[in-house]
């Protein structure tokens, strides 16, 4: 540590010595001096005032050297801004611990100074980095947004950011568009003003980039977010009205194709049944069922919906009437609809002692008799849902021709994109748990673009992960230690349509690991569920075993299965170009395998790595 300190001091002295002869060398020296001093403090360790001052002085002189130098150093402004931002975070964190008060009372002068300097530094770095297409620009954009969202209410911070926007190319903001739109309903008027002004300017120059994301926000259950999105969409209508109308139509119709009424009611009845019978939450049950009934009352718009009403409309109408009777009886008796302990069997309702309670529970039981009948009939029909005709489930998409709207994921920073010519009429339903659709869109370039249309899932998190992967790929490509090792992460287009639907770009030449094992076993005449058969034969009471007993049982069943559970290894060894197989420590059967590049990936991404976030209600 002492040696590094001496070297950094000597280097600083050389900066003065070479100052008149080489400004470029002086710039490099001050940057190294700051980097070395910062490297002496491990990440996460608080910087003392003296150390922070020394580092700031080094980076400050580096930025001053840039103005006298012939080179435009991105790193000087980046390091200077990042250091000030780190100190602002450190001071505000300490003040929170000491005082526990609001941000407005936390050393406002010191924090304000560091944040404003950081904002100016990030703006300069982004301006220089954008021109050089630096891979770190997106990091600076995110840090700049952090300054706005965390400290935008401090004096002059939002004004400084607003003034600096003219120095940043509009295209740079496209990389952080999801972060911008996620905060459009922020309460602070100062921050919201900056944000909305930026988005309006961005929409004027790049309206295509905002179409799909804004259509998602228009369907948000959060009222403030929906209102803010409507305001932005209205500003876009002033110059791109036809485009806005097309985007709204395509988004809503794709959701209609992704989740048919048949599936909507299947999922709704399943959730309502769990709330009522499992938790006794009648209020939650009604929150699920009433919107579904309200949708039916609006009438059918497609042939598929007409067939649904013809098959189930009468029973669902009767069930809805029983639900209304229940609500009326409970309300008239002055009671509150229960959120727990609300389920009563018919015998319990009779013994409850209250005629109103007994009558209300009887109405609810009658409704559930009808719901159960509908659910069983839907359950029988769903396995036969393998193909869809677009003219039956969405005539609007079937008839759409030569749209101004771009194919999802085709928009580029330079403003180029592929317009939608038409939607291919045949839609294939993949027979997995959520029954996603395989759809194709023909672009105005004559090519067909294939997508996976997913319902019942929120793809906004996956969109953020793809954004992260793009940044990682850029950093890997920039570093000379990694750019020759083909370490890039496979990415694909993701366009959320609402909080429970979206489209995912189709990656060709791929199959899931489950399909690889299935095909291998079929070719070798091994039952697909061979291990399961062996386990049940050895221990019919499998569910009552301890965890270790289950592990031992599974190990024994693998030993008794032909191939001893090495099916995946065998099939990958056969397909490998160099007979070398490197396995993942953790994977599941939704992982896909690319036959051309021999890469793994998963869709959606969060399925592979967010096990702690999976809701137990949706586990098999």
PLM segments and residue spans:
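Short coil turns that delineate tetratricopeptide repeat
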Residues: 20, 24, 31, 67-71, ...
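Intrinsically disordered, low-complexity N-terminal extensions of nucleic-acid-metabolism proteins
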Residues: 3, 7, 24-29, 41, ...
């Amino acid at each position: 540590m002492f040696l590094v300190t001496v070297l950094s001091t000597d280097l600083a002295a050389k900066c003065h010595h070479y100052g008149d002869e080489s400004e470029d060398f002086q710039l490099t020296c001050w940057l190294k001096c700051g980097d070395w001093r910062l490297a002496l403090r491990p990440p996460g360790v608080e910087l003392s005032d003296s150390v922070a001052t020394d580092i700031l002085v080094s980076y400050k002189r580096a930025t001053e050297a840039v103005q006298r130098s012939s080179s435009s150093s991105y790193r000087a402004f980046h390091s200077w801004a990042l250091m000030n931002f780190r100190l602002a975070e450190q001071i505000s964190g300490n003040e929170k611990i000491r005082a526990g008060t609001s941000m407005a009372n936390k050393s406002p002068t010191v924090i304000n100074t560091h944040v404003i300097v950081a904002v100016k530094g990030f703006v300069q770095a982004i301006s220089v980095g954008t021109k050089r297409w630096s891979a770190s620009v997106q990091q600076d954009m995110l840090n700049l947004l952090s300054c706005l969202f965390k400290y935008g209410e401090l004096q002059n911070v939002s004004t400084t950011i607003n003034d600096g926007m003219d120095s940043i190319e509009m295209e740079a903001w496209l990389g952080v568009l999801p972060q911008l739109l996620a905060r459009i309903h922020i309460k602070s008027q100062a921050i919201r003003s900056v944000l909305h002004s930026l988005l309006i300017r961005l929409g004027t120059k790049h309206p295509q980039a905002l179409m799909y994301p804004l259509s998602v926000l228009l369907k948000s259950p959060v009222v403030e977010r929906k209102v803010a999105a409507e305001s932005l969409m209205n500003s876009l209508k002033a110059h791109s009205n036809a485009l806005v109308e097309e985007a709204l139509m395509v988004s809503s119709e794709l959701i209609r194709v992704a989740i048919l009424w048949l599936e909507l009611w299947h999922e709704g009845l399943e959730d309502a049944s769990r709330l009522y019978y499992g938790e006794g939450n009648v209020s939650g049950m009604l929150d699920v069922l009433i919107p579904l009934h309200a949708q039916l009352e609006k009438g059918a718009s497609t042939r598929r919906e007409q067939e649904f009403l013809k098959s189930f409309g009468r029973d669902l109408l009767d069930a809805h009437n029983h639900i209304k009777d229940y609500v009326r009886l409970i309300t008239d008796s002055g009671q509150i609809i229960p959120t727990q302990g609300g389920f009563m069997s018919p015998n319990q309702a009779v013994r409850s002692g209250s005629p109103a309670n007994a009558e209300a529970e009887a109405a609810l039981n009658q409704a559930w008799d009808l719901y159960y009948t509908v659910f069983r009939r839907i359950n029988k029909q769903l396995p036969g849902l393998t193909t869809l005709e677009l003219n039956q489930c969405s005539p609007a998409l079937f008839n759409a021709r030569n749209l101004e709207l771009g194919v999802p994921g085709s928009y580029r920073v330079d403003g180029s994109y592929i317009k939608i010519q038409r939607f291919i009429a045949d839609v294939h339903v993949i027979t997995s748990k959520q029954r996603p659709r395989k759809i194709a869109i023909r672009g105005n370039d004559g090519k067909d673009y294939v997508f996976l249309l997913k319902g019942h899932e929120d793809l906004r998190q996956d969109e953020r992960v793809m954004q992260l992967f793009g940044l990682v790929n850029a950093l890997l490509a920039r570093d000379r230690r990694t750019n020759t090792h083909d370490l890039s992460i496979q990415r694909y287009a993701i366009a959320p349509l609402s909080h429970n639907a979206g489209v995912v770009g189709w990656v060709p030449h791929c199959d899931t690991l489950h399909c690889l094992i299935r095909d291998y076993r079929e070719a070798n005449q091994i039952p697909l569920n061979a291990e399961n058969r062996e386990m049940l034969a050895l221990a019919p009471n499998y569910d009552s075993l301890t965890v270790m007993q289950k592990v031992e049982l599974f190990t024994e069943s693998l030993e008794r299965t032909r191939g001893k559970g090495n099916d995946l290894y065998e099939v990958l060894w056969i397909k490998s170009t160099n007979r070398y197989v490197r396995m993942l420590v953790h994977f599941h059967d939704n992982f896909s395998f690319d036959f051309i590049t021999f890469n793994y990936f998963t869709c959606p991404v969060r399925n592979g790595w967010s096990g702690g976030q999976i809701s137990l209600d949706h586990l098999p």
